Amino acid sequence: MRQKSLNVLEFDKIKALIENETISDLGKEKVVDMAPATDFNTVEFQMNETDEISQIYNKHRMPSLSGLAKISTYIHRAKIGGVLSVSELNVIKRLIQIQNQYKTFYNNLLNEEETINYPILNDRMEQLPVLSDLYQSIHQKCDTYDLYDNASYELQGIRSKISSTNQRIKQNLDKIVKSQANQKKLSDAIVTVRNERNVIPVKAEYRQDFNGIVHDQSASGQTLYIEPSSIVEMSNQISRLKNDEAIERERILSALTVEVAEEADACLISESIMGQIDFLTAKARYASSIKGTKPQFTKDRTVYLPKAFHPLLDKQTVVANTIEFAQDIETVIITGPNTGGKTVTLKTLGLIIVMAQSGILIPTLDGSQLSIFENVYCDIGDEQSIEQSLSTFSSHMKNIVEILQDTTKNSLILFDELGAGTDPSEGAALAMSILDHVHEIGSLVMATTHYPELKAYSYNREGVMNASVEFDVNTLSPTYKLLMGVPGRSNAFDISKKLGLNMKVIQKAKSMIGQDEQEINEMIASLESNSKRVDEQRIELDYLLREAQDTHDALAKQYEQYQNHEKQLMNEAKEKANQRVKSATKEADDILKELRELRDQKGADVKEHELIDKKKQLDDQYEAKSLKQNVQKKKWDEINAGDEVKVLTYGQKGEVLELIDNNEAVVQMGIIKMKLPLEDLEKTKKTKSEPTKMIKRENRQSIKMELDLRGYRYDEAMVAVDQYLDQAVLSNYEQVYIIHGKGTGALQKGVQNHLKRHKSVASYRNGMPSEGGFGVTVVEIK
């Protein structure tokens, strides 16, 4: 899309606001590269992608992306045989940790809300690679700044020797500096370091009393820094051990780097996906700040923006307006007073289209509709912008020439004060001719003007609509409200009257302009009133229609769930019946086997065909029980309304409410009322009702990543924290959030003091602004 137009519309400021919401350089780079797309499928995909994350962001606390950083340079170095440092490996480890936490969060989300559907995010979560082995390798060997002592058996042995040797050196030196005989010979009773060797400060005149190596002297030469001979060999041993340590450290880091290289492609996939999520989350945060909504994109030429406002203006004072190109309308001409909001309307339309085609939720009410534009062209003087000064007629015309050369049918053109800066009669004629030319091309146009000739232009051309910005004659100021379909009218007489001009002067002036023009002004005033009323009614109707559609969707969903539940009950009943039949058949086979054994042992006169007949009788009986309706072969007592019965298909008890045609009965089973055949019912004796037992259902799903303590007393909160942290440890969480609110700060202080002493807590900190600030404590689990 034309960069000049993006600059005029100040799209760079929108990008800067979104960039401020990102966490990582990965997200920032994607914001910098963000530009409006022009392919329908791409635009729709980008918007759906942002909308999915926005829905989640507005309803849930999302996992922190803090610490997410670029790893591509590290991966490249690993692939070409370089060795990564501990800090670089920890950056890769943090990426894996973030992706795992996000995947856990998403899986918990699916468990909580079985009916949610986030297809794009779901695809991304499925693409996330499994990097558990690499994570564990780094986690077990790398501390924050160095390798753990137990990163390898050899490293542990070397560091143990270094530690014990240092201890011996310390004991030896302490003995020397604390010796009473040496107190007057030392400049100071301390041990210091020179050239990476432990030394003691000896007065120069006592040099001969100390055997050792002089490593340095003071500026005055009165103090010599001597390494006593008793520790020289031990210090040499330390040097050798440190060299061994460096070699072993390099070996471990090389091995870890090889593991990274083996997972290079997977790590880059993870980086790309989590960078995209950072980018989308930033767009979601920005959308939340402007209450952005998702537009519907259409392949027909459509622009409908209900209650749209400019996102860079003060949200407390900005006036929202409905901007629309009605059916078959290709040109909208806006008239009205200076500083009345005409230019802001143009920029609002252009900026919203650019935002939408960049996958950013737009500042309108729900229900907006947009087509996709190949380009947005602007000729806006920008006298209201700090960046530019008033353009001359020549510069305007040069810009218009470029626009007319490049524009297409699928373009949007925004003209501000078309034809201004020259003789009014020539300017008006030129403006109408330009609009005619653009109409022939087929571009959509919104233009502002002061020329009264252009008010009549729409009545002589098809596809052209007037609009105006409202002026309040009572306050003598613009209201910044846009009136679609209503041309601007002169307010000179009303303003003059309000300011106290003599009525005779006003009446004489009215007589000079002619009756027709007075009637036109009165007609326009009537149109303004009607337009405002219709606009309000339309918004109300749109709201009611959306509400009705939401209700319909909810009912359809509930009906589908009911049908699925009923089907599940039937399947469970059939399965239970089949299991009973299987058990009965096995029992029959066992009985026949015993009968045959008994016959063989006793020599009983039982023929094989008799046994087979008996088996057949059993088979007949069990087959009857396995039928869909579980038909009974026996004749049961007569069933009447009010009887308590057992429903054989479901194995549940119920009460007969009424009989239907002696073949069916209406039975109440708990909250379910069903019509069933009599042959599926077995009459039972009425039992005394027992007290209802409460069954506690254990929640086996993973716990949430946050604990909300708001409203808890101190003692209750501490118990809840202990229980929650135990569950978090069992769930393998590494980071959780404890919400205590700000209030007086007493609960926050109590929680953090408690965390200090908790065995499962590695560290804790106050939440960042994006995490809830001082109202949240972020806990790192050991």
Curated annotation (Swiss-Prot):
It is an enzyme of class 3 (hydrolase). It holds the Pfam family MutS_V. Residues 707-782 form the Smr domain. Its EC number is 3.1.-.-, 3.6.4.-. It comes from the Bacteria. Keywords: ATP-binding, DNA-binding, Endonuclease, Hydrolase, Nuclease, Nucleotide-binding, RNA-binding, rRNA-binding. One of its GO terms (molecular function) is endonuclease activity. ATP binds at G336, P337, N338, T339, G340, G341, K342, T343. Signal peptide: none annotated. Disulfide bonds: none annotated. SMART domains: MUTSac, MUTSd, SMR. GO terms for biological process: mismatch repair; negative regulation of DNA recombination; rescue of stalled ribosome. CDD domains: ABC_MutS2. The keyword Metal-binding does not apply. PANTHER family: OS10G0509000 PROTEIN, OS10G0509000 PROTEIN-RELATED. Homodimer. Binds to stalled ribosomes, contacting rRNA. Belongs to the DNA mismatch repair MutS family. MutS2 subfamily. Endonuclease that is involved in the suppression of homologous recombination and thus may have a key role in the control of bacterial genetic diversity. This is Endonuclease MutS2.
